[in-house]
């Protein structure tokens, strides 16, 4: 009997404690989405039980009808108060104008896991700044044009041959997009950053894919690791999460150790030169520094880039008029040449519009966050926009997926309409309502390369094939609740029909 009373007392005490915690925004007069006072998970319940994707969760928080016209909305990451920023000007304040008050991302790796803690996305400001400056030299427009493009053309040619082999003597065939797009993007990544002639499209398999997919295998430990890194950063020293699996970390270390192309100027070479130019006690001298950056570059581009290419093909298949207009533009571009130059590819207007619209519906980053690092003891004031001071340590989230599908800024937001980015309508796009790769100093380092890769892949598919929906094509995209990235929960199938330009 005593045990029952103690249990009841504990439950009631916990409930009162949670009520107090969850009263944070109400007591300050800030619009908020109150979680159940019986749940210690805050607003993360569906995510923690793998019922909703990261992107969909933050979109729901952003678009909740209870928010009305609120510029910021409070919610809870377990018991930690967090902000959802919904106003474009405040988004600009957080990501760009007042970057010095929001220097870090909220997530954090365990310091005892250097393979995770040293990576560009998880490194804290001073380490991040140096690493970013080093790695950004690989992504200049000049290098993309003069060095990368020819290598990417080779992979794009392999993509054409891959489809030719899949169809054989047939005029059309229904194919899944996932494997093809993954082979394409990992072949590009291996060639550009590790000087590896991966050849996944030629062989139909890739060790890079095998190793990377292991990171997405869902098990209780992996779920705990991801949730710890993203939502319990202060507990990582206790929970000891691993960003990479041991097998993946070992593979990346071997890849770096076996790298023997000092003249290539690839990612590994660039990072090794960075190490040589720093003192012996510099953070970059850690044995895992190069492997950690190599590992995160592959991971960041693997699912994001391949899924985006699949989504773009899916939308083109559902909109034959848009696909025909794009193919007409490509047909004209290919009249006098068998291969498009970098400059020609980058100046095709309708191709650009199609890719921009694909990135609106399926942004490379579904959400971003920044942790308030204001040196002022009370925090950073959002006045005159909102009467609220963001305290040091509080995370501010931006749902890019929510922003890009907000009917306040995008009429018929779920309709695939490249004309939004045409000469007439693009002038009316509200600043900071289109940020598919994030924005500001922490914006995606590989954004331009990602767009180039998408354009090249789409061009070399449509050059030889017409794509259309079939009986196996999903009627709508549902995002995988077991993936951190935006990827389809179900495989996307399309019919590929031989139709040279």
Curated annotation (Swiss-Prot):
Entry-linked InterPro entries: Cyt_P450 (IPR001128), Cyt_P450_CS (IPR017972), Cyt_P450_E_grp-I (IPR002401), Cyt_P450_sf (IPR036396), Insect_CytP450_Detox (IPR050476)
Record: residues binding heme: 444
The protein's required cofactors: heme
Membrane topology classification: Peripheral membrane protein
Job of this protein: May be involved in the metabolism of insect hormones and in the breakdown of synthetic insecticides.
Family to which the UniProt record says this protein belongs: Belongs to the cytochrome P450 family.
Protein name: Probable cytochrome P450 6t3
Native source organism of the sequence: Drosophila melanogaster
